[in-house]
Swiss-Prot record:
The keyword Hydrolase does not apply. It comes from the Bacteria. It is found in: Cell membrane. Produces ATP from ADP in the presence of a proton gradient across the membrane. This is ATP synthase epsilon chain. The gene is atpC. F-type ATPases have 2 components, CF(1) - the catalytic core - and CF(0) - the membrane proton channel. CF(1) has five subunits: alpha(3), beta(3), gamma(1), delta(1), epsilon(1). CF(0) has three main subunits: a, b and c. It comes from Nocardia farcinica (strain IFM 10152). The keyword Cell division does not apply. Keywords: ATP synthesis, Cell membrane, CF(1), Hydrogen ion transport, Ion transport, Membrane, Transport. Its main location: membrane. One of its GO terms (cellular component) is plasma membrane. Pfam families: ATP-synt_DE_N.
């Protein structure tokens, strides 16, 4: 793990059922109830509520960009640290796209199920377009 500097920040992506990722990053973006937010090192402290069916992007200091479908929860920024605390989350590569598309096509699906499925499909499409 790289030493903390003004060029990077500590990031934790955690869901109720598991810790998805923890490490140093240069950029994080997420969809909150107030809109899309991008965080770089040195950002002012803040607390935001994540949307259902949102996407989180993390640009780690080392390795490839991380994209996750995130369903509800909170996003906090404090001195040098970003924490994404989600009700549930999955990496784009873990998404069963066919299943998510079936939910989107199901007219009996609830609004929440539709938002989650939309977020899952968008996460996969974002990785595919990179």
């Amino acid at each position: 793990m790289a030493a903390e500097s003004t060029k990077d920040m500590s990031v934790d992506l955690v869901a109720v059922e598991r810790r998805l990722w923890s490490g140093q990053a240069t950029f994080v973006s997420a969809q909150t109830t107030e809109g899309q937010i991008g965080i770089m090192p040195g950002h002012e402290p803040l607390l935001g509520q994540l949307v259902e069916g949102g996407i989180v992007n993390i640009v780690p200091v080392e390795g490839e960009r991380i994209v996750a479908a995130v369903h509800g929860g909170f996003f906090s920024v404090t001195a040098g640290t970003v924490r994404i605390l989600a009700e549930s989350a999955e990496f784009a590569g873990e998404v069963d796209v066919d299943e998510a598309r079936k939910v989107l096509a199901d007219s009996a699906a609830s609004d929440e199920e539709l938002r989650v499925a939309q977020g899952r499909v968008r996460a996969v499409e974002q990785v595919a377009s990179a």
